[in-house]
Structures are given as C-alpha cells and as structure tokens.
Amino acid sequence: MAFKSLLSFVSVIGALQGANAALTRRVACPDGVNTATNAACCQLFAVREDLQQNLFHGGLCTAEAHESLRLTFHDAIAISPALEAQGIFGGGGADGSIAIFPEIETNFHPNIGLDEIIELQKPFIARHNISVADFIQFAGAIGASNCAGAPQLAAFVGRKDATQPAPDGLVPEPFHTPDQIFDRLADASQGEFDPILTVWLLTAHTVAAANDVDPTKSGLPFDSTPELWDTQFFLETQLRGTSFPGSGGNQGEVESPLAGEMRLQSDHTIARDSRTACEWQSFVDNQPKAQQMFQFVFHDLSIFGQDINTLVDCTEVVPIPADPQGHTHFPAGLSNADIEQACAETPFPTFPTDPGPKTAVAPVPKPPAARK
C-alpha cells in the first residue's frame, strides 16, 4: 500500500507541476517583492526570512534547525485513532499542542528538552499572523532546507490549532522495541506507516543529535556528518558498537562505533530487525532515496489530524536545499570488517575508508538565545 501511495503522490506532484507551469497565474504579494500561486502563501515569505536570519543564523544547518525538525514529529505523532475508538481523546496530531500547552507536553518523558526550541520559536509566532500548528511544521521545513542534500519539504497553511493537550504515551521512545514503534506509527497514521515507512521517517536522524539521553552530554550526533543530509547515518548504525560517548548505561542508548557519536537503541534494533534490515541497508549511498522517501513521509506526517482539503499548499516558499556534499565512506579506522551484516538478501556494499586517525565526532553546540 505504501508504494502505491508513493507512486500516486509522485504522479500527482508531477502532473500538478506540469499543469502549474502552464496554467497557474501567480498572485502578487503585498510585500511588492514576491509572488505566489495562492495569496494565503504570501505571509510565509516574511516568516521564512525572519526564521533564516534570526533563528537559523543566516540559513545554517545548526542545532536550531535540527530541533525545529524534531519538533514537527513530536507534535504530529501525538494522535491515536485507537484511543478515539475507545471514547478517549487521542490527541490532534499536527495541531501545535506541544507549543500551546508546553507546561504539560514538554514534561512528557520523550519530549524532555523540547521546551528550549519552543521558547526560541515563541517570539516568531507572536510577530507573524500564523497558527502555531502551521508554524511548527513550516519552521521544521525551513530548518531542514539549510542542510545540504535535504529534500524540499512540504508546507501547508490552514491547520486548526489545538484546544487541549495531547495525552501522554503517544511519542515513541528510544528504548521502545521495534514492535512498539511500528504499532505506534501504524496507529497514528491509520495504517499507512508500516515498518518500511518507519525506516523512511528515520532518515531525519541524519541531521539529528541527542541532548537528554545521556545526562552528562548534550548535542551528541547520530552520525559523523550532522550538518549534512546524507546517508552516513544508515551506514554508521550498522557498524559494530564499541563504546559510549559519555557515561554509558543510559536508557535507550547502546554502544556506538565512534567517539562522540550517540546510537539510540531503537535505531540499532530497527537496523537489524528482519522486517527492516534490507530496507535500512538500501539507503546506504542512495541519496535520491534519502531525499524522496523522507519528502513523502513528511508530507503525510505534517498533516496528521488535519483535513488536507482545507489546507493550502505553500511548498513553493520552502527553499530548495543545496546539493549534497561529499561521498559515502567508512569513517577513518573502520571498514567493511566492522559491519554487522543484518540484511540476508544483499551483501553490504564496499566503500573507501577516510585516511587518518580513527574518527571522533564533535558535539553539535546547543542553541544559544536566538535574536529577538
């Protein structure tokens, strides 16, 4: 079903792009500079410029960009049709509840630490005419666009803001089993996000870092290139873990192959699960797949709980990211001999090893106070 949906999505996008190029009349925006296919998108140009200059440091793939993308997931995934079927409020999905009720939702265990990016984003929401729900997803898309190699992510306006907080227990934790994570995503997506699409969604970890898994360390990247949207994450999670970057023994953490690199237990187990191991390996050195599949799942994730027929597509406002940089490689000191082969169908591909002493990964600096 997922692949049929993707084919339909790609076909529709291609048809719309062709039709738009030939038929769409653009609207002149009130700023006298920009034009848009829908007047509702005009407001986003000012939001974009404000974000780029005053939150993302002139358009950089920094901690603020990483955390803004993370926030999109933690807001959107908080929806459960299964709870609703029991007569229990199951959350509103991509409705902004995590930022509207931060005193409640940022105290949920998987959301610990997100209060910082929510506080940084508050002044931007206050000075622009945009719903909290729309802002969270838009800021995540803009933040990701600053990471070379990323896809252009979807942006919509018209979401309804939350009127009550989401219940606890709806955001997956790094210590959850694959079955728990697969079941949670299937519930939130009404069956669309199967184990394969879960792998696609985890592509976001290519530009992610952990601030709260290890209480003694912050900004621990999940791969050696957290500033790039590449496929090193998929390669490095299949390397044999040898040590912890900090105190070790923390819930949701397993040994990683590189000094300074964090490996989540959930990434480790999904990369080695028989249902997902080959899909995981298929992302290694496949940049188009790392872009297209995440673009697809983000599109759907960003509208969980919303009626797409009431939304306006403003993806054109999101910058097209820079081309990917570098090449797939084994970090210095490691090679195919260090791979824990999990896919039974296809041998792990061979790549060059970086020269020099064994790679150590620098932490991603925590966000300083954004310029108000």
From Swiss-Prot:
GO terms for molecular function: diarylpropane peroxidase activity; heme binding; metal ion binding. The active site is at residue 74. Its EC number is 1.11.1.14. Its cofactor is Ca(2+); heme b. Keywords: Calcium, Glycoprotein, Heme, Hydrogen peroxide, Iron, Lignin degradation, Metal-binding, Oxidoreductase, Peroxidase, Signal. The keyword Metal-binding applies. The keyword Calcium applies. It comes from the Eukaryota. Glycans are attached at residue 129. It catalyses: 1-(3,4-dimethoxyphenyl)-2-(2-methoxyphenoxy)propane-1,3-diol + H2O2 = 3,4-dimethoxybenzaldehyde + guaiacol + glycolaldehyde + H2O; 2 (3,4-dimethoxyphenyl)methanol + H2O2 = 2 (3,4-dimethoxyphenyl)methanol radical + 2 H2O. Binds 2 calcium ions per subunit. Binds 1 heme b (iron(II)-protoporphyrin IX) group per subunit. Ca(2+) 1 binds at residues 75, 93, 95, 97. Pfam families: peroxidase, Peroxidase_ext. Residues 1-26 form the signal peptide. Gene3D superfamilies: 1.10.520.10, Peroxidase, domain 2. InterPro entries: Ccp1-like, Haem_peroxidase, Haem_peroxidase_sf, Ligninase, Ligninase_C, Peroxidases_AS. CDD domains: ligninase (cd00692). GO terms for biological process: cellular response to oxidative stress; hydrogen peroxide catabolic process; lignin catabolic process; response to reactive oxygen species. Residues 346-372 are annotated as: Disordered. Heme b binds at residue 205. Pathway: Secondary metabolite metabolism; lignin degradation. Belongs to the peroxidase family. Ligninase subfamily. This is Ligninase C.
